[in-house]
């Protein structure tokens, strides 16, 4: 009988952030396929787990998957882990999972830590729906396409960025979509955890960029393409400004400017809507 491929989420920083079930699976499987066996060794040692490991990263996944599938076909259970968080989310593992599915092997998720959801939950920005965009490309042509895609999004987006590119990326985001509300997380769950909230311009002033991968949550405005957009009512504008001032901590003036840009209105038009709502008692 074939074994099972377990997709195991591991801590994104604090080694205590791992489920009892994940620890049991890591102890019981025959082999752990790890993005970096050295980093995984620290986690296993912390929890006294002696299961053998093998490397599975972006440079060897295509060639290594076949041998792992053979072990699974032979009845071995295998756990897939990344350096941090949930495998395949901007991490290796997708090829192995697809190969296992094609081979009729059971793939079972073991949920747990996620930098995406951790940053989103603590951001104070709307979370009912969001778009995850991974890492912005590094090549100029690809970055241009990536930012053009972001500009067409209306709502909350989450993406990762490296420390040596975070300021460049946030400045480019500001030029593309305006000074939108953001929450920028660094070293989440670690000793030097930092989560900076506010408009991009203010967040950049307080941002430390010395180390640690960044997780960015941003509330992007309406699409600026030629599609028809229904103008929001005065009540909707007032409610939107209220959410920004209450949850993100923006001043009323900044919230008005952001809402105006988002909906293609003048700040005076939005201000008048707020004043009209006050007078009518809405």
Name each model-derived stretch.
Residues 34, 109-112, 159, 184:
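General beta-strand structural signal in soluble alpha/beta enzymes
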Residues 92-94, 252:
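Glycine-centered tight-turn and secondary-structure capping sites
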Residues 4-8, 74-82, 130, 155-159, ...:
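Generic beta-sheet signal
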Residues 1-59:
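Glycine-rich, flexible N-terminal cofactor/catalytic loop recognition
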Residues 2, 77, 156, 163-282:
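A contiguous loop/helix-start segment that scaffolds small-molecule binding in enzyme catalytic cores
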Residues 95-153:
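Class I SAM-dependent methyltransferase SAM-binding "motif I" and its flanking Rossmann-like core
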Residues 25-32, 104-108, 156-157:
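Short active-site oxyanion
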Residues 55-63, 136-139:
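Conserved helicase motor
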């Amino acid at each position: 009988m074939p074994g099972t491929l377990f997709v195991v989420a591991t801590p994104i920083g604090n080694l205590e952030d791992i489920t009892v079930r994940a620890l049991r699976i890591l102890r019981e499987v025959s082999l752990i396929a790890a993005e970096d066996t050295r980093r995984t060794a620290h986690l296993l040692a912390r929890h006294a787990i002696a299961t053998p490991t093998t490397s599975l990263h972006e440079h060897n996944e295509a060639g290594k998957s076949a041998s792992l599938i053979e072990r699974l076909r032979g009845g071995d259970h295998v756990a897939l882990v990344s350096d941090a968080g949930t495998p395949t989310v901007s991490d290796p593992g997708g090829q192995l999972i697809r190969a296992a599915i094609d081979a009729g092997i059971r793939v079972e998720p073991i949920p747990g830590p996620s930098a995406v959801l951790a940053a989103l939950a603590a951001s104070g920005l709307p979370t009912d729906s969001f778009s995850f965009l991974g890492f912005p490309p590094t090549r100029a042509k690809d970055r241009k396409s990536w930012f053009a895609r972001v500009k067409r999004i209306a709502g909350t987006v989450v993406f990762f960025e490296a420390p040596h590119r975070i300021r460049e990326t946030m400045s480019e985001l500001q030029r593309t979509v305006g000074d939108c509300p953001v929450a920028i997380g660094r070293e989440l769950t670690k000793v030097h955890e930092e989560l900076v909230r506010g408009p991009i311009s203010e967040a950049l002033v307080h941002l430390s960029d010395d180390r640690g991968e960044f997780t960015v949550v941003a509330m992007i405005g309406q699409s600026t393409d030629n599609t028809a957009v229904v103008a929001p009512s005065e009540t909707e504008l007032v409610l939107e400004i209220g959410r920004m001032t209450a949850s993100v901590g923006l001043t009323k003036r900044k919230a008005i400017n952001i809402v105006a840009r988002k909906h293609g209105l003048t700040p005076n038009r939005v201000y008048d809507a707020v004043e009209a709502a006050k007078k009518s008692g809405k």
